Design a protein with these regions (language model features):
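Residues lining hydrophobic/aromatic ligand-binding pockets adjacent to catalytic sites
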Residues: 2-194
Length: 194
């Protein structure tokens, strides 16, 4: 094995698939996106962020879970199918609107997320990957310009400061800071994101 290949392998980072990943997950991912491999060959563990996310609401943290079909305990993550027996998509969308409608960037980004709650995707990893692609694009798109902005930043005492810990979804930060999300993630600690 060549030294360059060995260095590349040593720099690889394996992350689990996540449903609207946490701030911490995106900080790890954005530190070196080309070195990240999403783990899909593991046995699917229950009660993890692979099919859950935690958002901040006025009443405190709210966990949203994507229901999945389970064949057996040894089922690989890549084979986990989403269950549509419940109206979870409608419930999740209502929760997102309720939690974020008063944040500065929700109106600008909502249309990027709405389709995920209208259409069905068979496999959880595919669903997560599609959402991740949108989030990554929005975070990295420094040329995103808000045209004819009319929103006010006077929130009259409402604390909309996103939580950077406790597994909170990246959506808290994205809807609050919009194109400045990458800058806010850089300020969490001294790791410089590329």
């Amino acid at each position: 094995m060549l030294d360059a290949e060995r260095q590349t392998l040593n720099k690889r980072m394996i992350l689990p698939t996540t449903y609207m990943g946490s701030v911490e997950w995106y900080r790890q991912f954005l530190a070196n996106p080309s070195a990240v491999q999403i783990e899909v060959m593991e046995s699917f563990p229950k009660q993890t962020y692979r099919n859950r996310c935690t958002i901040t609401t006025p009443d405190g943290p709210l966990t949203l879970s994507v229901p999945v079909k389970r064949a057996d305990s040894k089922q690989l993550t890549r084979d986990v199918e989403i269950s549509y027996q419940q109206r979870w998509q409608h419930q999740h969308w209502i929760a997102l609107v309720s939690a974020y409608k008063r944040t500065p960037y929700f109106d600008y980004y909502a249309d990027f997320f709405r389709p995920f709650y209208k259409q069905e995707t068979r496999f959880l990893v595919d669903f997560n990957e599609k959402i991740h692609e949108v989030i990554h694009q929005l975070i990295r798109n420094s040329e995103f310009k808000i045209q004819n902005s009319k929103f006010t930043t006077d929130w009259q005492g409402v604390n909309l400061e996103p939580c950077f810990g406790n597994g909170q979804s990246i959506l808290d930060t994205l809807f609050e800071y919009g194109p400045e999300t990458i800058l806010k993630l850089n300020n969490v600690n001294s790791i410089k994101l590329v």
